[in-house]
């Protein structure tokens, strides 16, 4: 990071600091997708968003092009220094003699994807396939789904799996598949150093005075929110805090 993280945050009533894993991680891409979905309800005067992800400048450029996340709000660092300072979960750290640091990281990542040292990951993976009546519809009927191994198709296809009032079966899994294809197709851009593949992130919401209103530390892969059905539900703290300030 070459500029202050909180630069130009002075006029915002709240500051949301997102410490992301690798920019090519499932969690980073999915978190950015949710933020873009809610962007109109999160004007900069209401909440200043700053994200720090593991990668390079090239990683950050590709990430923003793909997700639509604002480049001005994204900071990248190559070695997870902030993650270590905040004591965020570094992931499973099984070591086997004879393996390089990179190969150790890959082994631990695969084990975490299988649920070892990563509580809730398998449950969250299955939720993406079976649907979730507590989550909103994710793909609009007229949206064209591209970037997966499947031929392009319209979002209305998911009507076959259920009504539009909630997350239908395979809907979230499709978004995750699209993210996976994007990352694997540009692996060395997104992940210039595989030593930090298992590093997890965290979420921190502050008011304008610097008081911490909410925090979440990721316990594992696909654990970037306390409520994965509604990952941004914690932003209700902003409304509650605004009412409190108004009554003061």
For each predicted feature, which ranges?
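N-terminal targeting signals for export/organelle localization
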Residues: 1, 236-248
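Short active-site neighborhood of thiol/selenol oxidoreductases, capturing the structured segment around
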Residues: 4-42, 48-52
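Short acidic, S/G/P-rich loop/turn micro-motifs used as interaction or catalytic elements
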Residues: 22-26, 57, 220-221
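Short, surface-exposed basic-aromatic patches at helix termini and helix-loop junctions that form
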Residues: 40-43, 63-69
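Thiol-based oxidoreductase modules, predominantly thioredoxin-like and allied folds used
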Residues: 44-59, 71-79
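Residues lining hydrophobic/aromatic ligand-binding pockets adjacent to catalytic sites
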Residues: 47, 200, 229
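Thiol/selenol-based redox catalytic cores and closely related redox-interacting motifs
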Residues: 77-220
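A short, polar/charged loop-to-alpha-helix boundary motif
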Residues: 219-241
